[in-house]
């Protein structure tokens, strides 16, 4: 191979590596945008301002809560309530308990999903901890609030008539660990 073809190959490989790194950082925002636009994957609606509904529905719905932690994240993460029964339009506050089981400060982030997927568009989050980095110090335990309601139009949608239970599921993933010695950070 000539020096010119070696240079071309090196630049091509470098470009490929840079593209892969950039794509990996952009994948979560791109996925979030895709889910928000298409409603795919049980993505919920999100209120930008806390709107407290004055009119409530009549059909009770059970909301179950699920919590998962990636194997690389030494946290305990559980819902404080296993389930609640609400009616559409009823604002609801629940908590998830999170505990860092390690000797190091760790930053994690969570993603969520609502099942059945077709009902996700009616699940409106007013406040939650998802998609935001959460720092838990070594051995720290915190309560993380989620405020939500089911849109009143849920009752009017014929496709929702058979749904009596929704599940809100969160999964936490490790972003990075901060070593116990100051100034030393693991990435």
Swiss-Prot record:
UniProt-listed Gene3D superfamilies: Ctag/Cox11
Keyword Transmembrane: yes
Main localization of the protein described in the UniProt heading: membrane
Cell compartments where the protein resides: Cell inner membrane
Keywords tagged on the record: Cell inner membrane, Cell membrane, Copper, Membrane, Signal-anchor, Transmembrane, Transmembrane helix
Disulfide links within the chain: none
Cytoplasmic side: 1-9
Membrane topology, Periplasmic segments: 31-187
Alphabetical list of InterPro entries matching this protein: CtaG/Cox11_dom_sf, Cyt_c_oxidase_assmbl_CtaG
GO BP, one annotated term: respiratory chain complex IV assembly
GO MF, any single term: copper ion binding
Membrane topology note: Single-pass type II membrane protein
TM segment ranges: 10-30
PANTHER family linked to this entry: CYTOCHROME C OXIDASE ASSEMBLY PROTEIN COX11, MITOCHONDRIAL-RELATED, CYTOCHROME C OXIDASE ASSEMBLY PROTEIN COX11-RELATED
Cited HAMAP family: CtaG
Record function comment: Exerts its effect at some terminal stage of cytochrome c oxidase synthesis, probably by being involved in the insertion of the copper B into subunit I.
Name of this chain's protein: Cytochrome c oxidase assembly protein CtaG
């Amino acid at each position: 191979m000539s020096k010119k073809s070696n240079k071309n190959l090196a630049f091509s490989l470098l470009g490929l590596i840079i593209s892969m790194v950039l794509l990996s950082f952009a994948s979560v925002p791109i996925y979030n945008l895709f889910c928000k636009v298409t409603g795919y994957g049980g993505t919920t609606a999100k209120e930008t301002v806390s709107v407290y509904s004055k009119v409530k529905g009549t059909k009770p719905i059970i909301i179950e809560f699920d919590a998962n932690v990636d194997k690389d994240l030494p946290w305990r993460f559980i819902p404080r309530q296993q389930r609640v029964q609400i009616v559409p339009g009823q604002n609801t506050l629940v908590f998830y308990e999170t505990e860092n089981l390690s000797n190091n400060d760790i930053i994690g982030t969570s993603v969520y999903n609502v099942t059945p997927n077709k009902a996700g568009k009616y699940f409106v989050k007013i406040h939650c901890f998802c998609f935001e980095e959460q720092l838990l110090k070594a051995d720290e335990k915190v309560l993380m609030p989620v405020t939500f309601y089911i849109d009143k139009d849920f009752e009017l949608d014929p496709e929702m008539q058979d749904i009596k239970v929704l599940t809100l599921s969160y999964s936490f993933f490790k972003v990075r660990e901060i070593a116990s010695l100051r100034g030393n950070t693991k990435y």
